């Protein structure tokens, strides 16, 4: 189902259709090559020795027994990397941390890489790890942000004790990496005038992105000093740049070939294995292939932050928000980089609030370094804010959506993080929820006597953009080879090709999109931040406009007239003064040799204006008051897509994000031992929702065009994860009358809350 909010008048021929994805046949027939499918003749296999401790000092590493083994071809420790500074508090999310690739002199989490080896087979490489003798001094560890900020907590990074602390962190310990403050108006005065104030504290645990394909890399470092990497990542240019920096070699010496990728959700942006495979290849003189197993993925790759969040909202008697504050402490794991800015942008974004203060703290602890996960930071704060708003609505005896619509953000208003809204779809998305049959239908009673409830929640992602390039080669038969630089995770190749085809009025099946390697196409930023359809789509649009201009020039040459006498429409050029003179796209393509040679369109750009996206969910649940188990009965997902280039893919993103959000709300968490070991390191034990757990999710596309894009595109890959957490929580609250403040709402935690209330 699609809601055409204000886009019905737009007349597109390709955009808004649902063509078969260009890579679909290869993927369903098994012909698509993923990273682990790639091999080179004579390759070695690399494996990693990981720390058995959550926090320890490395006293010595004895490699003598390994080096004696006839099938050991290379061994790598931190000393083999280029000299790099120790991570400071200023390290941002996504910055390469060499010490996370291999530990320097301390390990900071169980699973932290210490040594890498290469051997003639993966089994031998695994055996070699047992020959390495590492002596550790085990140190006290800390695993929760609320505990890590204490001055008494063990300090992870010793040198931080001598660095200046972030502002306004009095009474906190040296594990605080950053404190960010955003404010407008005067929140304290706003609360003084408020007729009703609600304040709550929430806790969420680390969850993993749960991509189906583990990390992998194959490297070959030639004798001439040229490094080629084949890997599955969310950005091969980022892998190239980060690997070159970690290894201390020129970017020009590294080529990265992108393989197909089996999911990422933000977790496959940083390099993990690529630098290791590269150095092992350099030392052995042979190609080296590496891949993680699932235990390694969960033990040692970035989850999202665990958190402690405090939200306070004050409203007038009629529900108008007078003031709001948010204080959140996000764990970043072993190294700094928690998504404070993303959380600050999202926390109150759906609403117009004059008086706001936001405090975000980045806290390191003894867990794997966190990485991005669909709208980094936003789902956590949306869970808190949307839960508080539902409590406000309940206290005021007000419809939850009426409260939200009354306070909805609009164009021209300033977000708390300083951004002034352009055209946005907050109210349109809320109104779509309010008017939907799901929201207005009776919930019904459970035949088994269980408690039922219906909840709503709003979400937001600011969306990002970045640099993007595209090259369009027109072929003599009128087809087009379109080379772009964005790794395809969610069907973006087809969405990019649709935007190209729309400009030229040709069939999208005649456009053949490819993801080029780092030597083939210009720099393109990572597939993340919901930016691909926006930035690479815009690059395709610009390349198509370049082709269109050249088509007009070729026709003018054939007709011996000026270019202002030629126009282009619906895949044909025609003479303005003589309608009988007309040529199709294919006809001009066939005449390229006679009119000047190849037609190649290109684009290199760094567009701004990606435009934020709003989402919402209506979720019905059933709660078993005896066991605490929550079952999902019905789900409707809403999202402002700006313009839905390929509605199937938009709906798929909405459904997928909703599933992940429900998993975050109900099941997903790391079970940690007292020693910092993650105990559920398989997908049997790390419980993600399956089709057996959920009903069909009904997607509703809202279209409020983004004025910052030629076709009005907004990214749709992330905001959809933010709303389900609160929608499930609010549904459970309305079913039971009990507000559960911690995620996940597992049967055990819900049952405990019921017992306490009883």
Write out the residue ranges for each language-model feature.
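C-terminal catalytic domains of large/alpha subunits in multi-subunit enzymes
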Residues: 69, 78-81, 248-253, 283-288, ...
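Glycine-rich loop/linker segments at domain edges
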Residues: 17, 23-26, 91-93, 97, ...
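Thiamine diphosphate
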Residues: 241, 260, 264-285, 289-290, ...
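Extended active-site and interfacial segments that coordinate phosphate-rich ligands
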Residues: 22-26, 130-139, 143, 234, ...
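Flexible, low-hydrophobicity surface segments
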Residues: 1-172, 197-200
